[in-house]
Amino acid sequence: MTLLSPGIENKEINLASAIGRAATGRAAMVGKFEWGPAYSITQVTSESDLVTIFGRPNDYTAASFMTANNFLKYGNDLRLVRICDATTAQNATPLYNAVEYTIGASNGCVVGDDITITYSGVGALTAKGKVLEVDAGNNNAASKIFLPSAEIVAAAKSDGNYPSVGTITLQPTQGDIALTNIEIIDTGSVYFPNIELAFDALTAIETEGGALKYADLIEKQGFPRLSARYVGDFGDAISVEIINYADYQTAFAFAAGHTLGDIELPIYPDGGTRSINLSSYFTFGPSNSNQYAVIVRVSGEVEEAFIVSTNPGDKDVNGQSIFIDEYFENSGSAYITAIAEGWKTESGAYNFGGGSDANAGADDWMFGLDMLSDPEVLYTNLVIAGNAAAEEVSIASTVQKYAIDSVGNVRQDCVVFVSPPQSLIVNKQAGTAVANIQGWRTGIDPTNGQAVVDNLNVSTTYAVIDGNYKYQYDKYNDRNRWVPLAGDIAGLCAYTDQVSQPWMSPAGFNRGQIKGVNRLAVDLRRAHRDALYQIGINPVVGFAGQGFVLYGDKTATQQASAFDRINVRRLFNLLKKAISDAAKYRLFELNDEFTRSSFKSEIDAYLTNIQDLGGVYDFRVVCDETNNPGSVIDRNEFVASIYVKPAKSINFITLNFVATSTDADFAEIIG
């Protein structure tokens, strides 16, 4: 402000700005996992994180899981996007194997009465149904019933009708009930890829003339709106026990012959009961009739126990909200989610089923990769796409080519790591495997000159291709698996950043040692390596007593230039990121001599440090009136030109051994 009377005004101006070092070891990957949020970017820093968030490997997910885990053996910052097929994926729910029905003629029923169920060819079933609601204005006709499903499902599968059923007749204790349109629900009946979309999915109801939605079906069964937190058949192992305030108090009331904490819960939708002791899981229980004790089991083992409430104002002893909607939205459970709407007041145990996440196609991989394409949303400099190589050749080629074209070439600040399709190289003779890789890489089969439709015929400096597979032990399933090497090659880049600098090559005996290899798919001899290296494929080779080594550092370009090496590509990615971040602070400043010279000084200082560390041989920065003439200034532009002589890695070593006579003069020979 302007002083209007004598005084002192302090102003602070910062002229000490500098260019900071950009992170270089962050990787991103899209893949198939058995658990975890789908189509959401999640940070993973360790194998423990990976297992906790995304589950363990199985035959469907092993390539993605082990590729991600292999990267984490070298680096510690991985951003993952789980994919699934939205048309077939399902969250597991208590609706699976519940009996869906339409009540026809009914009268004279009483709420709470048992229902005897008779199945054609089987007779009366052991488990009894229950009348849940009646319509007093319609002769006490039953409007909602519960039918325990375990015996019905078994009978339907036995007679080959499942998910349809044979003839079922019902006889309540009082009155009559006749059913039509009886079916067994054979899916989870709801899909949401991540928790942000859960509420809408759990509240959606039937549109006029449309099929019943999850909310309609769950309400009809009389169940609370519960679901597995994520899609996938891992959710089928979940079981949830809910105990209301009154039953919790009764469980801890003194009574002859009663063990404190014991309670018996009806099981839905199967039927039967389950006995548990609450004192094993809770130190305090529900404090009012709005609150419920919840126990979550996975494969029968208790994983979580907590208190939730249907009242939006309720909090726990730490002041955190336990309102059902907020509790689950805020990651209160790692396994389930629920909403307060439609919550049931009765206690019960609910078995989940119907989860699915199989059949992800190339389109699903592409949707996931699209989430990595915007550098303003996510900064990453290593993109792993080679886990898709375990898919069939057409998907492997399409997905990896898309990763290069739509992520690497669009962002131009990262390197995409790809691997050859597994079926082309695993269990093949070396000559056949090399020919297969050549055909895939060039689009021309070298054995007959025919076009190869599913190929990786691209030329770019923003991709790196490896040329082998490793046979690796899967400790989670006690077996060995063939795994693509893209995660390891990206990991070597992160490891190189840790022990050296990004502009150093990740290949060779010093920094290129591949971990966790039992054996390689192909033993690449010199002739094989020569053939692959000429088309930009980096061999991975086993040397007796010296480990398994990345034995090449080319990018995927077919043009001879400085950028045909990984270290130069990564050097320039680093420079572009760091200097462009600093350039943001010149936006909306004046294009004058002070702005230009200060920016040039920052770049000079930054590049001098890079030069001192061996990243560049020399550089020159031009940011003055020669490239910022009046015409540039009048267009509100600002131009800086940065010339760099990048350091080159050694790929070929020549050792000249010369024998001379005993009295030869080296000065004369060498000069």
Curated annotation (Swiss-Prot):
Task: Specify whether Iron-sulfur is a keyword of the entry.
Answer: no
Subcellular localization = Virion; Host cytoplasm
Q: Which GO terms describe its cellular component?
A: host cell cytoplasm; virus tail, sheath
Q: What is the lineage of its organism?
A: Viruses, Duplodnaviria, Heunggongvirae, Uroviricota, Caudoviricetes
Could you tell me which PANTHER family the record lists for this protein?
PHAGE TAIL SHEATH PROTEIN (PTHR35861:SF1), PTHR35861
> According to its UniProt record, where is this protein mainly located?
virion
What Pfam families does the database record attribute to this sequence?
Answer: Gp18_dom_I (PF22639), Gp18_domIII_N (PF22671), Phage_sheath_1 (PF04984), Phage_sheath_1C (PF17482), Phage_sheath_domII (PF17481)
This chain's protein is named: Tail sheath protein
> Which family is this protein grouped under?
Belongs to the myoviridae tail sheath protein family.
> Quaternary arrangement and interactors, per the entry?
Homomultimer.
Alphabetized InterPro entries for the sequence:
Gp18-like_dom_I (IPR054565), Gp18_domIII_N (IPR054564), Phage_sheath-like_beta (IPR035326), Phage_sheath_subtilisin (IPR035089), Phage_Tail_Sheath_Structural (IPR052042), Tail_sheath_C (IPR020287)
List the keywords (alphabetical): Host cytoplasm, Viral contractile tail ejection system, Viral genome ejection through host cell envelope, Viral penetration into host cytoplasm, Viral tail protein, Viral tail sheath protein, Virion, Virus entry into host cell
Record keyword Coiled coil present: no
* Role this protein plays: Polymerizes as an extended structure around the baseplate-tail tube complex. During ejection, the sheath shifts to a contracted form, thereby making the inner tail tube protrude through the host cell envelope.
One of the GO BP terms on file: symbiont genome ejection through host cell envelope, contractile tail mechanism
